[in-house]
Swiss-Prot record:
Allows the formation of correctly charged Gln-tRNA(Gln) through the transamidation of misacylated Glu-tRNA(Gln) in organisms which lack glutaminyl-tRNA synthetase. The reaction takes place in the presence of glutamine and ATP through an activated gamma-phospho-Glu-tRNA(Gln). Belongs to the amidase family. GatA subfamily. One of its GO terms (cellular component) is glutamyl-tRNA(Gln) amidotransferase complex. Its EC number is 6.3.5.7. GO terms for biological process: translation. It holds the Pfam family Amidase. Heterotrimer of A, B and C subunits. SUPFAM superfamilies: Amidase signature (AS) enzymes. The gene is gatA. GO terms for molecular function: ATP binding; glutaminyl-tRNA synthase (glutamine-hydrolyzing) activity. It catalyses: L-glutamyl-tRNA(Gln) + L-glutamine + ATP + H2O = L-glutaminyl-tRNA(Gln) + L-glutamate + ADP + phosphate + H(+). This is Glutamyl-tRNA(Gln) amidotransferase subunit A. It is an enzyme of class 6 (ligase).
């Protein structure tokens, strides 16, 4: 099941041209995004030019799988000649002089960039309420959040503004929004995709990810954007068909680990969806094995010490001098720094910078940052030990369905919504979220996590799951939004 392959067939048969397809999506964005606020920058002229180029390639019979396929990018991937804001006043007028590796790889495949997507400022948030350009609405219920930080990426695909979108995942920022919006999304193994040209939040956690309706589309796109990059020393590269190599194989004999203690306190409807999902995996031949994962609250605390520290270092570059917002009223250098950063950053970003600088202070370093790094290593070892017994670990993607805007403005309450997704980021492991049911008529997602660079096991398992148990109910309901 693949939207990309369906669109490929329509384009290759001449049923529709790339320009016509692009115009359809652009028109839908212009007509409907006023309610959702998922797009920061619409790239109409650029998209139509790229679509014309794609049509010429198709006419010459030289097209690839992705030639002419429209895509939307989270607005932290640099796009040459198009502004890249990271949803911050600090970068409101920043036009990137180069393409990120992710966007370049998409362009090289002949894809059509429709626009840049809203997000939590500098990817710091779980609700997409922390954006200089306003909150994003969940297409399933406009009063609710789409999740974050890649809320615009999830909302746009759920609303039908593009068949696919890019996102980034530092602590669950593709998987939690996918759960809230009824989509499939994947954070690949750390190092499988390049971070070059991706606005940094926490460099040892950040990883590009993909949103789509179907796991097959997510796998196809990850194959397209993954690979070695000379500009990112952490990018180890993966073989060409790393994510798609086993999609057609059944999953009989695969072992899925489940920690029951993570499920027993969930709302009843989510517990029911989880139970049904595990039963379906058993029907496909998988074995369910009881395991014990590391304490998730400890993982959450570790994450919210290390990532602010990395953020404080990464965001030190925004000083009002080299690029970004500059306060026009500053009278001296100190005032320029202070006013530019005070005005240019939003409240959540400033909160995390302050936390980061505090834990990095010489008086606190050993008590907080150093101990958190030690705990990160211990947790990674514990999780990897589980994979000596199982092929994948299953857990919910979020402890709840999408909540209403304003319900979790308390930072700690919002941070807890990442509790199931953070372990994969702490340990650099691949994880995929996919729809498993409904709670209060809103979608909820499950999550599978695998050993590092066993990404193909995850895509295989979810492709086979969706092949036999489908997600058409999610697609049909979204079509009526």
């Amino acid at each position: 099941m693949s939207y990309i392959k369906k669109l490929r067939a329509r384009l290759d048969s001449g049923e529709i041209s790339a320009v016509e397809l692009t115009k359809e999506y652009l028109a839908k964005i212009k007509e409907q995004d006023k309610r959702i606020n998922s797009v920061i920058t619409l790239c109409e002229a650029e998209a139509l030019k790229e679509a014309e180029d794609a049509d010429a390639i198709i006419s010459a019979g030289k097209q690839g799988l992705l030639t002419g396929i429209p895509i939307l990018h989270k607005d932290l991937f640099c796009t040459k000649g198009i502004r890249t804001t990271a949803a911050s006043k600090m970068l409101d007028n920043f036009v990137a002089p180069y393409d990120s590796t992710v966007t370049k790889n998409c362009k090289d495949q002949g894809m059509v960039t429709l626009g840049k997507l809203n997000m939590d400022e500098f990817a710091m948030g779980s609700t997409n309420e922390y954006s200089y350009y306003g909150a994003v609405s969940n297409p399933w219920d406009l009063e609710r959040v789409p999740g974050g930080s890649s809320g615009g990426s999830a909302a746009a695909v759920a609303a039908g503004f593009a068949p696919i979108s890019t996102g980034s995942d530092t602590g669950g920022s593709v998987r939690q929004p996918a759960s809230f919006c009824g989509l499939t999304a994947m954070k690949p193994s750390y190092g499988s995709t390049s971070r070059f040209g991706m606005v940094a939040f926490a460099s040892s956690f950040d990883q590009a990810g993909i949103f789509g309706h179907y796991a097959e589309d997510v796998a196809l796109m990850l194959d397209a954007i993954a690979g070695e990059c000379e500009f990112d020393s952490t990018c180890v590269g993966v073989k060409q068909n790393h994510f798609t190599q086993d999609l057609e194989k059944d999953i009989s004999g695969k072992v899925i680990g489940v920690d029951e203690s993570l499920i027993k306190d969930l709302p009843a409807q989510i517990q029911e969806a989880v139970s049904k999902t595990l039963d379906n995996f058993k029907k496909l031949g998988a074995e369910i094995k009881s395991v014990k994962v590391p304490d998730l609250k400890e993982a959450l605390s570790t994450y919210y010490i290390i990532t602010p520290a990395e953020a404080a270092a990464n965001l030190a570059r925004y000083d009002g001098i080299r690029y970004g917002y500059r306060n026009p009223e500053a009278r001296d250098l100190d005032e320029l720094y202070r006013k530019s950063r005070t005005d240019g950053f939003g409240a959540e970003v400033k909160r995390r910078i302050m936390i980061g600088n505090y834990v990095l202070a010489s008086s606190q370093y050993d008590s907080y940052y150093n101990k958190s790094q030690q705990l990160r290593k211990v947790m990674t070892d514990q999780i990897n030990q589980i994979f000596t017994q199982v092929d994948a670990i299953f857990m919910p993607a979020s402890p709840s369905e999408a909540f209403k805007k304003g319900d979790k403005l308390d930072p700690v309450s919002a941070y807890l919504s990442d509790i199931y997704t953070i372990p994969a980021n702490i340990s650099g492991l691949p994880a995929i979220a996919f729809p498993i049911g409904f709670a209060n008529n809103l979608p909820v997602g499950g999550q599978l996590m695998a050993k590092a660079f066993n990404d193909n096991i995850l895509t295989q398992m979810v492709v086979q799951y969706q092949k036999h148990y489908g997600i058409e109910e999610f697609i049909l309901q979204q079509a009526r939004i």
